[in-house]
Regions:
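Juxtamembrane/interface motifs at transmembrane-helix termini
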Residues: 46-49, 58-60, 103-105, 193
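Conserved GNAT-fold acetyl-CoA-binding loop/helix
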Residues: 35-58, 70-72
């Protein structure tokens, strides 16, 4: 089984699409900022590091096997400007499970773009790819990301205390999850945030 999204993935204000070499400057613009990288599993990146990822892990356009991530750029539909990225990891084909992550340029925070992009990636995971369960693993100090997971209808299932040694400290991890049936029930009831909020 392979997961073949049709690009771009559209939402009211955004287009999600695979990143390419033309995006190097835009990717470096936010992935080089130390504060952006504080809670994510990578260090600030320069153009060389971004180029290596574009030729490797980020070159993927489809998901063909467990453990593969799909990284999509978050582009403003009105201007074509790349302002962040979202990731869908296909964790298990057998269990139809995945994980999401998101990174946004800080100049665009507080405007609902991260919520809209994550909402769209969950729609892809559940409604287009048929996954059953999606998780988000959040550093407990990353309050914005935890609030975003809750806005998406994800429930906090665990608080793992000093779960791993991460960037020079013992890190607590919050695990959030949502099932496909829960996602569809929330969408049908109108309880999910508007994709643009």
């Amino acid at each position: 089984m392979a997961l073949h999204p049709s690009y771009p993935l559209r939402s009211p204000r955004l287009a999600l699409r695979p990143v390419s070499e033309q995006d190097i400057d835009a990717l470096v613009a936010y992935r080089s900022i130390p504060d952006v990288c504080r809670y994510v599993p990578f260090e600030p990146m320069d153009a060389t590091a971004v180029r290596e990822r574009l030729r490797g892990l980020w070159a993927r356009r489809v998901l063909e096997a467990d453990g593969q991530p799909l990284l999509l750029g978050v582009e403003l539909a009105a201007t074509g400007e790349l302002i962040g990225d979202v990731m869908l990891l296909w964790a298990s084909a057998e269990h139809r499970s995945g994980e999401i992550g998101y990174v946004l340029h800080p100049a665009y925070s507080g405007q609902g773009y991260a919520t809209e992009a994550a909402h769209r990636i969950l729609h892809l995971a559940f409604d287009e790819l048929g996954l059953h369960r999606i998780i988000a693993r959040v550093d407990a100090e990353n309050h914005s990301s935890a609030r975003l997971a809750a806005r998406l209808g994800m429930r906090q299932e665990a608080h793992l205390v000093q779960n791993e040694w991460f960037k020079g400290r013992w890190s607590d991890e919050l695990d959030f999850a949502i099932l496909g049936d829960e996602w569809r029930a929330l969408a049908h009831s109108g309880c999910l945030p508007d994709a643009s909020s």
